[in-house]
Regions:
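Outer membrane beta-barrel transmembrane domains
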Residues: 34-42, 47-53, 57-74, 78-80
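Alpha-helical junction/boundary sensor with strong preference for TPR arrays
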Residues: 26-36, 68-73, 94, 101
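"A position-specific structural signal for the A-helix of alpha-solenoid helical repeats
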Residues: 4, 8-11, 44-48, 85-93
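Extended amphipathic alpha-helical interaction segments
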Residues: 1-43
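Alpha-helical repeat scaffolds
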Residues: 17-31, 56-69, 107
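Short coil/turn linking the two alpha-helices of tandem helical-hairpin repeats
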Residues: 7-16, 49-55, 98
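Terminal, low-structured helical/coil segments at or just beyond the last alpha-helical repeat
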Residues: 72-144
Length: 144
């Protein structure tokens, strides 16, 4: 219930006056939901982040949901339908976000990796391709 209230606090001007910080409240609700095996608060966080237009919060919502949806964190059987609906909500928000920015829906890794994420540059690549990308040491270069 607190996650739902927090979403309302973010969406309706003046509704959050005198209330706790809405995103902190949603994060607390997400932790409770993870322990109980229900990720509805994650979906509400994604919806609120989408409505706010804050890319950082939206990506955090996607990554938080993905981290909470691993095989070692199964859904509570009593609330499987609600959990499944929450997953569909997050996937729908992700698909819309991806489509607006890239023209295609979110792929399998679309909740954790994004099109503009910087790739880690690995110097190990040169070790395996024979060093073709690296300059020869000065001693092996012809004198000028």
């Amino acid at each position: 219930p607190m996650a739902t209230r927090a979403v309302i606090w973010t969406l309706l001007p003046g509704a959050g006056d005198g209330k706790p910080a809405p995103y902190a409240t949603m994060k607390e609700s997400m932790q409770i939901g993870e322990k109980k095996g229900v990720r509805l608060a994650h979906a509400l966080y994604a919806v609120a982040a989408q409505a706010s237009g804050d890319d950082a919060k939206l990506r955090d919502a996607f990554r938080s949901y993905a981290a909470a949806s691993t095989e070692d964190k199964p859904a509570n059987p009593q609330f499987r339908l609600i959990d499944k609906m929450a997953g569909l909500m997050v996937r729908g928000v992700a698909d819309r976000y991806w489509t607006e920015n890239t023209g295609v829906r979110a792929g399998d890794e679309g909740l954790t990796t994004f099109w503009d994420d910087k790739q880690e540059d690995s110097s190990l690549d040169d070790l395996f391709d024979g060093g073709s990308g690296a300059e020869a040491p000065a001693e092996n270069q012809p004198a000028e």
